[in-house]
Amino acid sequence: MNTNDISAFFVYGTLKKSYLRGGLWPRKPLRIVAGAIQSDLYDLGPYPAAAPGKHWLLGEIWEFNYADMDPTIAELDLIEGYNPLRENNEYTRQIVTVEILGPESRPQKLRAFAYFAAQPKRLEVARKIKPFLEFLGRPVAAWPDASSRVPSSFSEE
């Protein structure tokens, strides 16, 4: 699969701009917009994890210049504990189709990288976050919800 045409990340947890890791991005994005993917969302305590599922998950799309993608991928892989050469990762990087609000308030689709839980067994004991918001006319889940514990420092993770 060709990934050279992808210049965006979909994030849904501590990498969002107003959260703990939102300031760790190595490059400045061209824009940040709301978007949703089809996925289930789980609360792992101080951060969430997504897994393939039937619900919709609300997050942010961070779009970059193509020239900024390699260093951004390298840094985010490190932050998310993903190494494509290792078997026991916490997360795995995948390509997703994201729906955003496009021109004239019409839904628009784009492809982006996103990190998903690499160890589904961990999710068996995690709290599933149910949809509680609406985006593009459909119910969506989002992190944090009213029961989530949001870390304010790295020592709280």
Located regions from the model:
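Glycine-aromatic micro-motifs
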Residues: 2-157
